[in-house]
UniProtKB/Swiss-Prot annotation:
Name used for this protein in its record: Magnetosome protein MamN
One GO biological process term: monoatomic ion transport
Lineage start: Bacteria, Pseudomonadati, Pseudomonadota, Alphaproteobacteria, Rhodospirillales
UniProt-listed NCBIfam families: MamN
Induction: Part of the probable 18 gene mamAB operon.
Job description of the protein: Plays a role in biomineralization; might regulate pH in the magnetosome.
Keyword Transport applies: yes
Membrane topology: Multi-pass membrane protein
Pfam family, one: CitMHS
Membrane-crossing segments per the record: 26-46, 53-73, 95-115, 136-156, 174-194, 226-246, 252-268, 281-301, 320-340, 358-378, 416-436
Miscellaneous comment: This bacteria makes up to 20 cubo-octahedral magnetosomes of about 45 nm in diameter which contain membrane-bound crystals of magnetite (Fe(3)O(4)).
Effect of disrupting the coding gene: Cells have no magnetic response but still make empty magnetosome membranes; magnetosome proteins MamA and MamE localize normally. Deletion of genes mamH to mamV (amb0961 to amb0978) gives cells with no magnetosomes and no magnetic response.
Species this chain originates from: Paramagnetospirillum magneticum (strain ATCC 700264 / AMB-1)
Amino acid sequence: MIGLLTLAVFVATFAVIYRWAEGSHLAVLAGAAALVVIGTISGSYTPVMALRSVYFETLALIFGMAAISALLARSGVYAYLAAGTAELSQGQGRWILVMMALVTYGISLASNSLVTVAVVVPVTLTVCFRTGIDPVPVIIAEIIAANLGGASTMIGDFPNMILASAGKLHFNDFIAGMMPVCLILLAVMLVFFERRLGDWKGSEIPVDPVWARGEALRHSAIDRRLLSYGLIIFGVTVAGLILAGPLKVRPGWIAFVAGVTALGLGRFKDDEFFSACGGTDILFYGGLFVMVGALTSVGILDWAVNWLEGITAAHDRVRAILLMWMAAAVTIFVGGGTSAAVFAPVAATLRLDGDGQAAWWALALGIMAGSVAALPGATAGSLAMTQYSGFVKRHPELASAAAAGLQFTHREYVRWGMPLMGIFLVLGTVYIAVLVG
């Protein structure tokens, strides 16, 4: 009975989040509080157990990398890179897509997808509308590239931070286990867009020439002092993460110290501090860990592990691949961070032959594949859609041009994302099969 009630609260919480994404951290905190109250009354989940279920190292990673990303973004370097890359494309639709996808991937290696998309999408919209190019395929490619970049490193996005803490993984493990396959998938994605768009050179939508002439691409001014601080802190942090294994120091605490330093040097205003340190994300994932702990305490995740082992018998390869596909399916609806928190305890129980970390890479690839399928699963999908609609509203003279191109809707995104999810899962299956051996 308690198990069913716990599961019902968990499902209800994410049903609320699905309808009210902006208040997701409040919904999760309310759900976590409800589960602690239920567990305390029933004796199945005490406040001490809830506290022990939190991956504090993950929260330290989120804090540290958010602060470093905020410092670099405040310096103007991200916007400068995006604008410079867009100008190098010389107004050719194909090159705008390729180059903006590559710079998005590069930024996402160290910054979460929300920061990356917040920087590159406004630049993309200005360049595309100025040159008469439909921006929707470019933005979709950027969202997917951001997910691939985030999946490539331990510090790129929230799911990998969770997996790093749960699996006691290090920075170098992700570079060796995830980056090579993600680079292959990035190349596959670019080929997919190339083939699907065909002879796509630009001048696809009618743009008011008066607006196009007046809307110059503005280079962001770089604060060299902040940039110097940011690059030094980031460089020292990466060096520390690389050496964390030999030094027997957990990566989260290296990132935490770096984050405190970044906040101290970043000259953030009082109303910017909470955002700069990833406050909303820390609240969300802290509450989420408590909720997942409640599922574990009543045996729901143990049941899932036993079910997975039962249907796959002793076939390690099949078990890892099934975990990957299941994670992808769940991520479409609840997002990568939630899937990572839910499936991490499952992956931790899998003992596979061959590469001992294969279960973690299977889970990471499944989460990444699911995150590209639909906007609810994509970390920055909703933000990109909001930026697109806001840009068109601020420039009503672009309404006819936007209407002439592809419409940036959930359905349009799925037309691109769902086939790519299938391709990524097939290639990921081959990769995991080789690792498990």
